[in-house]
A protein has these predicted regions:
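Single conserved hydrophobic/aromatic residue that forms the stacking wall/gate
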Residues: 1-16, 20
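Conserved glycine-rich beta-strand-loop-beta hairpin in the small C-terminal domain of fold type I
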Residues: 286, 302-314, 322-342, 377
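Conserved PLP-anchoring active-site segment centered on the Schiff-base-forming lysine
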Residues: 117-139
Length: 402
């Protein structure tokens, strides 16, 4: 199933604006409850709850003591870009030179740089659903048209190559991919991505943006870099960062590897908006990326325990359906449409937004309604919380909906 907004869609679209307004209202409600002293359990967070590893903290302290406090190069310190190149080779079998790397203020800015550098008015960008909330807004802000492709109901939130191809037209400029996926946690296999690449070989002018920010948070399904597939390196922008894997969301370091001409364009764009990323965070990022990924496996191991725990508990709630255990990230994305049209504690639930607001107001648990991700029949629940918090939160929800 493919959904295109009308040609006259404003920037950003009114639908996206409505979703954003509801998110803002829900966030404000959660803060209001907390300010009143209410014990709100936050299962809406898109960030790890772990502390930053000590060896990375030490690198930041050393950078301060070594007086790294001036503007950095727009595209990042050279030694950080070298560390990123080594990381791409070690983890992803990708060979980039430093002039193909741009360090940004978070992976979100990396993607925005690509959109603003590449998309012209009326260009279409194919976005499989569910998708991270900012993708469509970034496309719209660049005067592009987001084209949403929906997977089949029992496909574990993954579109097929045939569905992807059905969305491509002569106006398609870009395809956005995200694996492991936020919000579903689904991971595309190498075989699935190879089928995508066969389709895209027919359309050599299309650029692929591969958002791999959750790369290291996976539970057995190998995470594949799209650029590593035959014929895809020259037309893929690989986006990553330190936020999720190293629990460094507030440090705001993302980066991309891209064809040289596109990296140069992104560098120019960034130079007129933010310039270089935070200098201390960049120095810490060097240490984070140079160390073995094995040093952060303890986080992934704990996330897997929490994933199994929350699925077991949520599946005991009538009306919640987790189709398959997510293979990556730290979210579950249960289908909840069986609850629509029902009344709980005197409140009618007509949609996922109603359900999330009800759960927040009555059970004091924060979640995110699925319409933010292009899936209005689901809600996103993060298991980036302690096991005790997860048990208490799901117990509250179950009691409310029973």
């Amino acid at each position: 199933m493919i959904r295109r907004p009308p040609r006259s869609t404003p920037k950003p679209s009114s639908a996206a604006s409505d979703v954003y307004k509801r998110q803002v209202a829900m966030t404000a409600k959660a803060h209001d409850l907390k300010n009143q002293g209410v014990d709100v359990i936050t299962l809406s967070a898109g960030e790890p709850d772990f502390d930053i590893p000590d060896y990375i903290k030490e690198a930041a302290v050393n950078a301060i003591n070594e007086n790294y406090h001036k503007y950095s190069p727009v595209d990042g310190y050279l030694d950080l870009k070298k560390a990123i190149c080594k990381k791409f080779k070690r983890d992803n079998n990708l060979d980039y030179n430093t002039d193909q790397i741009v360090v940004s203020t978070g992976a979100k800015q990396s993607i925005a740089n690509v959109c603003m550098s590449l998309i012209n008015k009326g260009d279409e960008v194919v976005i499989p659903t569910p998708y991270w909330v900012s993708y469509s807004a970034m496309v719209s802000l660049a005067d592009g048209i987001p084209v949403f492709v929906h997977p089949d109901e029992n496909a574990n939130y993954k579109v097929t190559a045939a569905q992807l191809e059905s969305a491509i037209t002569d106006k398609t400029k870009m395809v956005m991919l995200n694996s492991p996926n936020n919000p579903s946690g689904s991971v595309f296999t190498k075989e699935e991505y190879l089928e995508f690449s066969k389709v895209l070989m027919k359309y050599p002018k299309i650029i692929v943006v591969s958002d791999e920010i959750y790369e290291h948070i996976n539970y057995g399904v190998e995470s594949v870099s799209f650029a590593s597939l035959p014929g895809m390196y020259e037309r893929t922008v690989t986006v990553n960062g330190i936020s999720k894997a190293f629990a460094m969301t507030g440090w705001r370091i993302g980066y991309l590897g891209a064809p040289k001409t596109l990296a140069k364009a992104c560098n120019k764009m960034q130079g007129q908006i933010t310039s270089g990323a935070n200098c201390i965070a960049q120095r810490a990022a060097i240490t984070a990326l140079e160390e073995s990924p094995d040093r952060i496996k303890y986080m992934v191991e704990e996330f897997k325990i929490r994933r199994d725990l929350i699925i077991d508990l949520v599946n005991q709630i009538n009306g919640f359906n987790v189709k398959e255990p997510p293979s990556g990230a730290f979210y579950i994305f249960p289908e909840v449409s069986q609850l629509f049209g029902k009344t709980f504690d005197g409140h009618l639930v007509s949609n996922a937004n109603d359900l999330s607001m009800l759960i927040l107001e009555k059970a004091h648990v924060a979640t995110v309604p699925g319409d933010a991700f292009g899936y209005p029949h689901c809600i996103r629940i993060s298991y980036s919380a302690s096991r005790e918090q997860i048990k208490e939160a799901i117990s509250r929800i179950k009691e409310l909906l029973t």
